[in-house]
Amino acid sequence: MTMLNGLRILDTLPLAALEVGKHWYWEIGNLKLHGQVFMASWVVIALLIIASLLATRNIQRVPSGMQNFMEYVLEFLRDLARTQLGEKHYRPWLPFIGTLFLFIFVSNWSGSLIPWRLIEIPEGELAAPTNDINTTVALALLTSLAYFYAGLSKKGLGYFANYVQPIPVLLPIKILEDFTKPLSLSFRLFGNILADELVVAVLVFLVPLFVPLPLMALGLFTSAIQALVFATLAGAYIHEAIESEEEEEHA
């Protein structure tokens, strides 16, 4: 009886609720678009454009301030692309890999540094763009299109010969691999960012002052790592598509 009375008392207490998965849809004809994802993505793109304009508005021979920081970022991205693609192939793909990294990095950090939930919208709530599976799948599909394009532009139709090398029995496995690559990229990024934001949101709700701060710092670190992993794997997949047999033997 004592236990039953205790359960009845618990039933009368208000429960904390944290809703996820609600979306504000924009209807364009027969299409339904996730409005809050577009809004958050535009904010991230605007931040990147503003940073670029600030860094290039007064270019100096001896860089300082914002220009110095942006040159460091560009040097980091160049080294990242060159490491994955090699000296011979990295230049045409540097803009793609650099854009991937910067968009994902700023999106991930915006989830911790921008108070999205304070901005009211008709339905759902704003969050980091990479907190939505649609964004991460779109980025992964872009990566898939990039390495297919890289392989076809480098080898022509001979690119498809890779599917039956070294033995034809590997054909089903290599076709399956083309589906698992974007899936693994998208779900890894989505799962890490969503989990980080949910943990911080719950702790802020329960203990709203100092306890969430270390987790927020850890979240910033893991968010940067996720951006690096995504860009690194994208470069590795593109290099795999364009690498010739002679280069493999030389390596």
From Swiss-Prot:
It comes from the Bacteria. The chain crosses the membrane at residues 35-55, 94-114, 133-153, 198-218, 219-239. One of its GO terms (cellular component) is proton-transporting ATP synthase complex. Its main location: membrane. It holds the Pfam family ATP-synt_A. It is found in: Cellular thylakoid membrane. GO terms for molecular function: proton-transporting ATP synthase activity, rotational mechanism. PROSITE patterns: ATPASE_A. It is a multi-pass membrane protein. Keywords: ATP synthesis, CF(0), Hydrogen ion transport, Ion transport, Membrane, Thylakoid, Transmembrane, Transmembrane helix, Transport. InterPro entries: ATP_syn_F0_a_bact/chloroplast, ATP_synth_F0_asu, ATP_synth_F0_asu_AS, F0_ATP_A_sf. Belongs to the ATPase A chain family. Key component of the proton channel; it plays a direct role in the translocation of protons across the membrane. F-type ATPases have 2 components, CF(1) - the catalytic core - and CF(0) - the membrane proton channel. CF(1) has five subunits: alpha(3), beta(3), gamma(1), delta(1), epsilon(1). CF(0) has four main subunits: a, b, b' and c. This is ATP synthase subunit a 2.
